[in-house]
């Protein structure tokens, strides 16, 4: 009985014929290792226990953007006082009531402190009335007021209260304007919740003390220091820096762009003066606009950012078609 011939290369006859592509390698034989840098083709899975090689030194995902308003270095380029005025006016018109009401409330509080202090000082002082009659028989009187120790104490306490209220107002308005610069929603209450009030008070005392010392040196050094320290309170409110660091940061910021700082200061002064010329009622607009210019300048010169003004969207609907005559 005949049997079919065995084909060369059959597994039953390992010695016969050449092994084809579908044959199995002998035991202990492995495929040659891949050349350096060779990996599995895209889309395949790595065998268990195999890890991809680490990236070369210095390689990694790109860093994310820094938080708004918190730069790592100064980038004063790109500041324009015209842009500052335009941005500030746009933001004021979008938040007019929210900005005007706090300024009005602070003005009433300041007037109350000044009026109460003046009234108590006069009431606690000694007054002496002297009557005069001239040769024509016309009588007149003069009143001499002599301040007593009690009146002096009241005046001193009134100055302290006024100074604290001014710093509180400054910090509160800056807090609201900084939130506007960050694009956060603000309310009237935002301007009465100043951030970092303790740092602001100490920073304000430091500025007043150094300005007073500079004023003793022929006045001009005090004016110069007051100018270069104009952003110290903003740094304390916005970045929680210490009083000394706030003053140093303000000096560095102003020094990075003296021209822009001067133009911004003049723009703020103009806004307030125009408000005074309008029977002081215009200061309800001038003070918020000046504060917004101040915040814009501080952010731009210190390398921070502000949310740019948003243009109104076009009306919803299909554009009109061609009109037939």
UniProtKB/Swiss-Prot annotation:
Regions of compositional bias (Pro residues) in chain numbering: 24-70
Membrane topology: Multi-pass membrane protein
Annotated localization: Cell membrane
UniProt-annotated stretches for the region Disordered: 1-75
Top-level taxonomic group: Bacteria
One GO term describing the cellular component: plasma membrane
Swiss-Prot/TrEMBL keywords: Cell membrane, Membrane, Transmembrane, Transmembrane helix
Membrane-crossing segments per the record: 96-116, 153-173, 205-225, 273-293
Main subcellular location of this protein, as a coarse class: membrane
Family membership: To M.tuberculosis Rv2560.
Name of the protein described by the UniProt record: Uncharacterized protein Mb2590
Phylogenetic lineage: Bacteria, Bacillati, Actinomycetota, Actinomycetes, Mycobacteriales
